[in-house]
Design a protein with these regions (language model features):
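Exported/extracytosolic protein signature
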Residues: 1-190
Length: 190
């Protein structure tokens, strides 16, 4: 967003206006979310990377990150196509892993006590398991939104990662031999 400003000078009944200056307002905190996955099937695990970048000269503390785990309404109730995998949160400040803040698995998943350092970034990496509520098929996708709030932010910030359903079949093959021990020229069954 941009803004403009002009000054007015008044003296002895005269008035003069200055030139108009234009500036740009940038968000002090930005958020991105990425799904590290080529698609999903029920039971798969999807890794998410959330990065908060702080351009302020002061750290932003007391932030809360809320992941909606892709929740949507079906049949009058909210269902969740993702479930946070406990113990998978990794928390990096400036690229160095730190002790992870408190996590509530939810749904929704909530991480409290997040700090975005002055002029730096914080990255959270975690995994979620795909549940039976994940939409299958050609049009199937999970829209997973994360919101950051608190820490003096005027309004919450959001970022969304979309992951599509994998359509290729999951094939397996196995072969067995009977009997396991065969004498010379004896019969085998596969």
């Amino acid at each position: 967003a941009s803004f403009t400003n002009m000054a007015t000078l008044s003296y002895n009944g005269s008035q003069i206006n200055s030139n108009v200056v234009t500036g740009e307002l940038r968000d002090a905190l930005t958020i991105t979310k990425t799904a590290v996955s080529g698609g999903y099937r029920p039971g798969d695990t999807v890794t998410y990377v959330v990065t908060l970048s702080n351009t302020c000269t002061a750290a932003l503390t007391g932030l809360t990150l809320t992941d909606d785990l892709g929740g949507y309404t079906a049949g009058g109730q909210t269902v969740y196509p993702l479930a946070y995998e406990a113990g998978t949160l990794h928390y990096y400040t400036g690229g160095t892993e730190q002790t992870a803040p408190a996590v509530t698995a939810g749904p929704p998943m909530t991480v409290t006590g997040v700090t975005a350092p002055a002029g730096g970034n914080v990255t959270l990496v975690y995994q979620a398991r795909v549940t039976e509520f994940a939409p299958p098929g050609v049009e199937g996708e999970i829209r997973n939104t994360v919101t950051v709030s608190g820490g003096g932010l005027a309004t919450p910030l959001t970022a969304t990662a979309t992951t599509a359903a994998r359509l290729e079949p999951e094939l397996t093959i196995s072969k067995a031999l009977s009997p396991a021990v065969v004498t010379g020229n004896g019969p085998l069954t596969y």
